[in-house]
């Protein structure tokens, strides 16, 4: 009986020693495999071969599921998937990365902007709030949250975030534009015009600023000035079909139906469906 016990003990010890000796080797092989797939993934990214890069990063994660490197790998995987237009897959990858590193600011921002690209502002808002709870001066998070607040018509909250953003970065162009558009929404037309004029003067080749100011001028019924801005915007971006629609709408306000129809025809030629402009065409008759 004693001999049997000793034999069983020795056999168990051999197994333990075998596992103890083999485990580092297994981990080493897994790490080497992960490193191989990671290097390939980065190489494919540099070549802009995104499908191959995605597959390599997946293989890298699978090679060592418990590796600390998986935070970085899953984040890169999400970025590649996003660039491929696979937003749901990207969000899933970012979420898995957050399981390894909860409340990582960079990953939360990546997931928030992916949510916004999908139109899921509510989930983006949660991520942005988590970012700002951890890093109160995060400019990008302040901008995107202000944008969401504006869409919700929570104008006071939006203004507070824009003010915080501009206190941090007074020349933040998107922040300045966002605040001007917010003033426009709230009917502060002269203030909005002044802010947009400052942006136009600083960036005279930016068609977006010209169109935004034109919209304010139209609301103030300063049609001739608005027309100058739209003409300037079209000169900068002559293939933007929506600018021609905007000018056509202005021409209709000015009772210039022939000019309006010509701009609508131009928008159709640039790719807009004629049926989507049917109401405006009727006004040209």
Residue spans for each PLM region:
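Terminal, low-structured helical/coil segments at or just beyond the last alpha-helical repeat
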Residues: 249, 253-285
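TPR alpha-solenoid repeat register
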Residues: 36, 70-73, 107, 141, ...
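Canonical tetratricopeptide repeat
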Residues: 39, 72-76, 110, 144, ...
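Position-specific recognition of the canonical hydrophobic site in helix A of tetratricopeptide repeat
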Residues: 38, 45, 75, 79-82, ...
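Short coil turns that delineate tetratricopeptide repeat
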Residues: 65-68, 102, 136, 170, ...
